[in-house]
Amino acid sequence: MKLPIFIADAFTTKAFRGNPAAVCLLENKLDEDLHQKIAKEMNLSETAFIRKLHPNDNFTQSSCFGLRWFTPQNEVPLCGHATLASAAVLFHKIKNVHSTLTFVTMSGELKARKEEDGIVLDLPLYPAHPQKLHEVEDLIKTAIGDTLVQDVRYSPDTKKLLVRLSDTYNRSFLESLTVNTENLLQVETTGKVKGLILTLKGEPGGQTQAFDFYSRYFAPWYGVAEDPVTGSAHTVLSSYWSEQLGKKDLHAFQCSNRGGELTISLRSDGRVDIKGGAALVLEGTLTA
């Protein structure tokens, strides 16, 4: 078996920042168990597998492909950064002739559009509903201790818990927070929560430029302690912060060690466009 494989850093234009994803191009059907084995071998938060949908398709001329995402532990229903990385490989390395690509996924059809300053992902927008604090208080205290919380929301579609920190905190505070993700696994065992979003209102002008909000994302339930930059989390964050700020166009920064920024536009059809850059950092062949 020889498979073309790439690593691209998503939601950045600089190598070694943003969120790295492995991208595998599948010329032929792959044994089901090999998807997970390859993802575990790559040991990144996600490995994406792009497959041809019809025998006569090819990666240069076709515009519609199948796409699946795997963490080192299991398959996930949606991954924004690995979708961006997949589109970047097809657009910039394979030189696909189309300006818009369609990916058939567990979350429906997702489109990626090439623009001069990045790639725009057309993603579903997920509402986050008010969450009773007492039901998740142990989880929140385990994650952030006595840190002041301003709002708690829950997205049943994505099983993500959104915790907004008090507006009295700033970006530096969010960046410095230590979250013991192993303890989260011991506290939340019901399956209700599969991802924890910590978020904070942006500061006017920010530290170097204006961001509407900041976030960090933790998903130990999927084998990912902290994800560097998370497109799927922003399908929830976009809905929340648009409502809070009364804006349809947002600029966001995810405050992981690697960091990454996202340009967001909520659409009238109930979906969201999320734009980011990508840097291709590795190209090779997987042999087994």
UniProtKB/Swiss-Prot annotation:
UniProt KW keywords: Isomerase
Domain of life: Eukaryota
GO molecular function per UniProt: identical protein binding; isomerase activity
InterPro entries the record matches: Phenazine_PhzF-like (IPR003719)
Catalytic residues, chain numbering: E46
Enzyme class: isomerase
Biological processes, Gene Ontology terms: biosynthetic process; maintenance of gastrointestinal epithelium; negative regulation of transforming growth factor beta receptor signaling pathway
One GO cellular component term: cytoplasm
EC number annotated for this UniProt entry: 5.1.-.-
SUPFAM superfamilies: Diaminopimelate epimerase-like
Protein family per UniProt: Belongs to the PhzF family.
Oligomeric and partner information: Interacts with UNRIP/MAWD.
Protein name, as recorded: Phenazine biosynthesis-like domain-containing protein
Gene source species: Bos taurus
